[in-house]
Amino acid sequence: MRLVLVRHGESEWNKLNLFTGWTDVDLSEKGVEEAKEGGTYLKKEGFDFDICYTSYLKRAIHTLNYILSQMDREWLPVIKTWKLNERHYGGLQGLNKAETAEKYGEDQVKIWRRSFDIAPPVLEEGDKRCPYLQEQYRGIEKSELPLTESLKDTIARAVPFFEKTIKPQMLEGKRILITAHGNSLRALVKYFENLSDEEIISVNIPTGVPLVYEFDKNFKVLSKRYLGDQEKINAKINAVANQGKKK
């Protein structure tokens, strides 16, 4: 069985080094090109899909659209779910990562960004950034929607969705593409590879690069690989790792 994961292309706030979370910002020009390049590599290597999954956030949705356009597969069914949204960064959303590191220290920012079970400061009730005040979540119970999340919290929504919805389809032979976010994809990577809480801290996923997993019938990982220029991919991974450091 094969599964392809793609983190959305660079967003406008990635470019500005801001904590984004559930803020619904679009792709930058570079992000559009990354998404198209990802689609080109998938087509070049002969990939095809039956069902696609993405989040409620336009940077992931648009990345998927560009990928499918490059593959001439815009007619494929697409299922959107908030369960694949980025981790909610609470009160950090909209703040510059480097400036936050200057204020609180790199160690604290790394804990907020990369720790397993420590969430950033919670949003106050009524803050305009609260998901329950936003249109795309109007059909979801307020109690289900986070005001901040740790990676552990993100796993608690993303992995059960995968197990209940996507995994059975894969076992039926469906070819699946998931276009989502750094932390919702890290949640799945931790689950697939049975990584420890400490090991996942150092995992960084580059923007716009297809990550291909091969599984056996028992869902054990047989192989994983990124599609594309490996030197460029490594540079992207290092750039993600350095986002929370002082200027």
UniProtKB/Swiss-Prot annotation:
PROSITE patterns per UniProt: PG_MUTASE
Annotated metabolic or biological route of this protein: Carbohydrate degradation; glycolysis; pyruvate from D-glyceraldehyde 3-phosphate: step 3/5
Active-site residue list: 8, 86
Record-linked Pfam families: His_Phos_1
Catalytic activity reported: (2R)-2-phosphoglycerate = (2R)-3-phosphoglycerate
Species whose genome carries this gene: Treponema denticola (strain ATCC 35405 / DSM 14222 / CIP 103919 / JCM 8153 / KCTC 15104)
Site (Transition state stabilizer): 181
Family: Belongs to the phosphoglycerate mutase family. BPG-dependent PGAM subfamily.
UniProt keywords, alphabetically: Gluconeogenesis, Glycolysis, Isomerase
Any one Gene Ontology BP term: glycolytic process
Residues involved in substrate binding: 7-14, 20-21, 59, 86-89, 97, 113-114, 182-183
HAMAP family per UniProt: PGAM_GpmA (MF_01039)
PANTHER family named in the record: PHOSPHOGLYCERATE MUTASE (PTHR11931)
EC numbers, comma separated: 5.4.2.11
Top-level taxon: Bacteria
Name the record gives this protein: 2,3-bisphosphoglycerate-dependent phosphoglycerate mutase
Keyword Cytoplasm: no
Protein task: Catalyzes the interconversion of 2-phosphoglycerate and 3-phosphoglycerate.
InterPro entries per UniProt: His_Pase_superF_clade-1 (IPR013078), His_PPase_superfam (IPR029033), PG/BPGM_mutase_AS (IPR001345), Phosphogly_mut1 (IPR005952)
Annotated SMART domains: PGAM
Record keyword DNA-binding present: no
GO MF term list: phosphoglycerate mutase activity
